[in-house]
Amino acid sequence: MIVVGIDHGTSGITACVMENKTVKSIFKMKRTEINENSFLKELEKHVNLNDIDLMGVCYSMGDGIDKITDIKKVENRGVINLEGIGKKVGGGTKVYDEIKSSNIPAVVIPGLHKGVKSMDERFNALFSHIASPEKISICYNAYKTFGFENFILSDISSNTVTLLIKNGKIFGGFDACVGAVGILHGPIDLELIRNIDSKKITANEAFSKAGVVKITDSYKGVEDTKFEIMSNYKKDKKCTLAVDSLVLSVSMEINSLMFLNHDKNVVLAGSIGTWKNPNISEMIKENIDGNVLVLDGDSGAVGSAMIAEDILNGKREILGISVDF
């Protein structure tokens, strides 16, 4: 059995080829590279396309579907629209359309939004959207890897999304625009609200630079800013403050869910959550009274492949989310 998992992230696309529960290869394409090259031609270097049994696809916010759905049944790529979601480059759209046109069997993973009824109704009442599709994939990877039925997952990268899993189902959480900051994205505060109202900046532009990048002079574009800030942690006072502030912010978000997390299991993921120098997970552990573990690697792409594999093996529910395939 051969499956492929797709993670549509802020800086690009990551794909995982898995055969019989074993990861065979992982490759990445920056969004700018995708605009100039065929994703499927790149994938073909790693696997015969005719041998793929199923692909698990993440795309954008996933707010137009509420089930893990056969790509043939999905309209408008599974989104309501592409507004208000951060910087748009177009690479993910090109990859999605290539996959759909190829007739390779595929399922599209939804985001977590108020239409997903398996979550606690209070979170759906509070927030219109909680997470994009790859966060479900990361959660499922953590669920399968560590075997926890109850845990908090915090994915820290360009943005930070923190989710609570109870009894093997996603209970709720905090989206990138609520609560903790990431490197690029974060919640909109009073100053940004004023700038939006005075038409100095759009709400989407404000969100896209409301992360700790606002503390530094280090914006190097969507793909390279995190490396600029993290590599200068010990050299630049603004970068030091930015990273320390991110750690504080994420720790606050995790701790805000701990009263619902009686097993006290916490899993950190994402390029910043797994960053070794400075060691972000160790810095966060100092602020958390619990069992803090790290999910290394390309957890979103691997998790998408795990979802595809388990669907082929007959699963009709993933972390409480129904499967329509």
Swiss-Prot record:
Q: Which InterPro entries match?
A: ATPase_NBD, Methan_mark_12
- SUPFAM superfamilies, alphabetically? Actin-like ATPase domain
Q: Which HAMAP family did the record assign?
A: UPF0285
Give the family per the record: Belongs to the UPF0285 family.
- This chain's protein is named UPF0285 protein MmarC7_1666
Can you name the source organism? Methanococcus maripaludis (strain C7 / ATCC BAA-1331)
